[in-house]
Amino acid sequence: MAQTAYTQGPSAIADLMIPKLLSPQTIQTRPGLVQRVRAMIENNQVSGIAGDLMAMAERLDSVPLLKQITCPTQIIVGELDQATPPSDAKLMADQIPNAHLAIILNAAHLANIEQPEAFNQIVATFAQELGKEKQN
């Protein structure tokens, strides 16, 4: 995909990535949000987009390191996420001691902007639970 960025530009990357980042329902019913995500992608320099894509493609598997995480961890994933599918998020949650996993319905990779109320509620609940633990 990095080559696509260099040869066809940011718009081509947006065309490829938007279906992975947003749910089909969002793409069909929220054109303003789709345009906002498109602008976020297209406003980047080609070299930055290509560099990010190459770095993601070449990154090492860090799953073995997850067991070393000792801080409270909340993993949030969209049920339709293609970039980090729920099965991958579950794998992470299973490897991190005492991790919490939340799956947001009708959302993909950008669940925080597709379903902000659900996302914010998960974060708020997690933070409240941390506060209760600290008091005890």
Short names for language-model regions:
Residues 65, 72-74, 97-100:
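Structural signature of beta-strand start/N-cap positions in the alpha/beta core
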Residues 17, 53, 92, 119, ...:
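Hydrophobic "lid"/C-terminal helical patch
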Residues 71, 85-94:
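Short alpha-helix in the alpha/beta-hydrolase fold that links the catalytic acid
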